[in-house]
């Protein structure tokens, strides 16, 4: 159990168009925090037709090639004696990207799976919309298929399907168990996403059950199931600004994970372990 904050693997920079700060800003912040590792994992580019259709705010493939990769390479070299800088992307699992994942992995250290869309009747639907039981099951099937592919080391906000769900029903339980079991089988780390707490407070989506605060994500019911299976867990800020690294919400989630005795890790097997 890691009980001291020493790394962060989920950060976004200005290229995604809904974050601030560049690679150097995050690296310097991590050095000041005395972290051993900082990973830059901005939202991965989509094919132009799909990005336009989804109106998804993220870098273009040209920005990825001309700005992102160069910035990461430069930071790795400049700070190699101070901190380990890892390069990555947070990206969805989509049929349209199947040929792109191996290319990304040839250029980066690792990929995070962040499934913000599911394909319903051949149309992509945002995970932040209200999902019915069948769509929750579809989310579970999609992320399990993604983990089976071997392309991803971390599953970001695995319980994000519950963003608009307060009643944790049997479908939520079944899909959660499906995801957790697959993460164990395919050696994918489950991420407790601190930004879910921030967003819950900002959007007033926190709620109470038996006088205990809960959030759409991180969702207590999900992480209680994770505890029963002892799956590997990583706490990440999902920072969209350098000052969102290691803030009061980060401390809160570390304390909660410690109380729950979750199997928290701060290194990725095969990458920096």
For the regions a protein language model found, what residue spans apply to each?
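An N-terminally biased module of ancient metal coordination in phosphate/nucleic-acid-related enzymes
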Residues: 1-95, 166-174, 178-179, 194, ...
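Short beta-strands and strand-loop turn motifs
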Residues: 8-11, 155-162, 190-195, 234-237
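Short secondary-structure boundary/capping elements
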Residues: 22, 67, 138, 214-218
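Conserved radical SAM core fold
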Residues: 47, 117-122, 199, 241
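Extended substrate/RNA-proximal surfaces in nucleic-acid metabolism proteins
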Residues: 52-54, 58-191, 260
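Active-site-adjacent C-terminal substructures of enzyme catalytic domains
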Residues: 167-247, 255-259, 263
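Extended, intrinsically disordered, low-complexity segments
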Residues: 263-273
């Amino acid at each position: 159990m890691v009980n001291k904050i020493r790394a962060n693997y989920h950060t976004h920079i200005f290229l995604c168009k809904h974050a601030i700060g560049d690679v150097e800003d995050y690296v310097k912040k991590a050095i000041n925090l005395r972290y051993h590792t900082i990973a830059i994992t901005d939202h991965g580019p989509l094919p132009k037709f799909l990005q336009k259709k989804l109106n998804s705010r993220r870098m273009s493939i040209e920005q990825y090639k001309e700005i992102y990769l160069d910035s990461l390479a430069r930071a790795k070299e400049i700070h190699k004696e101070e901190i380990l800088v890892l390069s990555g992307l947070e990206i969805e699992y989509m049929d349209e990207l199947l040929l792109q994942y191996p290319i990304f992995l040839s250029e980066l250290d690792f990929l995070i799976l962040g499934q913000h869309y599911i394909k319903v009747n051949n149309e992509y639907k945002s995970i932040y919309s209200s999902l019915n039981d069948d769509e929750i099951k579809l989310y579970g099937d999609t992320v399990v298929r993604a983990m089976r592919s071997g392309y991803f080391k971390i599953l970001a906000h695995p319980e994000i399907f519950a963003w608009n769900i307060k009643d944790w029903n049997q479908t939520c339980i079944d899909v959660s168990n499906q995801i957790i079991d697959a993460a164990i089988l395919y050696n994918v780390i489950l991420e407790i996403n601190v930004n879910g707490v921030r967003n819950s407070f900002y959007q007033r989506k926190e709620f109470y059950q038996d006088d205990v605060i809960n959030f759409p994500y991180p969702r207590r019911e999900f992480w209680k199931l994770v505890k029963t299976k002892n799956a590997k867990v990583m706490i990440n800020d999902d920072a969209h600004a350098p000052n969102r690294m290691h803030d009061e919400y980060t401390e809160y989630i570390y304390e909660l994970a410690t109380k729950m005795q979750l199997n928290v890790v701060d290194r990725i097997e095969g990458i920096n372990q």
